[in-house]
Amino acid sequence: MKFLTVAIVLAAAASAAPTKEVLPYPPVVAPPPYGGIAPDHNPPFGGGIPPINSGGLPPTNGAYPGGNNRHLCPSGLLYTNPQCCSAGVLGVADLDCKTPSSVPMNGADFERICAADGSKAQCCSVPVAGLALLCQDAIGTN
C-alpha cells in the first residue's frame, strides 16, 4: 500500500514538472507607425482625425467663464472681470453690475451688449452682489 502511494506521488510530481515548452510566446506587436491605428482595427471616423467640438464656445483665458476677454479687459490682477454697470461713483465703486447677457467677442460688441440693458461696459476688480469695486472702461470702447 505504501508502495502504491509513493508511486502515485512520484507520478503526480513528474506530470506537474515543467517541460521545455510550457506556453507559446505571445505574438510580438510593435506600436503602429507615427501614432496610427494598428492594421487589425477599424479606424474611427474613416481613418481621419476626429473633429474637436468645444460646445460652440470661444476659447477662454480663465477670467470670464465661457468667454474670451483677453481683448476686453487688461491682463493682470486688477480690472479683469467684464461687467455691465449702470452707475459709477468716482471710478471707485460701480452700482448694479452684472455679467454681460451674452459672450462679447470684442470691445465694441461688449459695449453694444451692455448698452442694450442701459449700462456701461466696465472692467472691474472685485464684483460682489451687484457692487463692483475699482472699475475702468473696457478696452475698445468709447
Curated annotation (Swiss-Prot):
Q: Which Gene Ontology cellular component terms are annotated? A: extracellular region
Q: What is the lineage of its organism?
A: Eukaryota, Fungi, Dikarya, Ascomycota, Pezizomycotina
Q: Which CDD domains match?
A: hydrophobin_II
- Signal sequence span per UniProt? 1-16
The protein's induction, as recorded, is: Expression is highly induced in the presence of root and stem powder of Shanxin poplar and under nitrogen or carbon starvation conditions.
Presence of keyword Disulfide bond: yes
* Assembly description: Homodimer. Homodimers further self-assemble to form highly ordered films at water-air interfaces through intermolecular interactions.
Name this polypeptide is given = Class II hydrophobin 7
Tell me what organism the protein belongs to: Trichoderma asperellum (strain ATCC 204424 / CBS 433.97 / NBRC 101777)
Gene coding for it: HFB2-7
Q: Which InterPro entries match?
A: Cerato-ulmin_hydrophobin (IPR010636), Hydrophobin_sf (IPR036686)
Q: Which family does it belong to?
A: Belongs to the cerato-ulmin hydrophobin family.
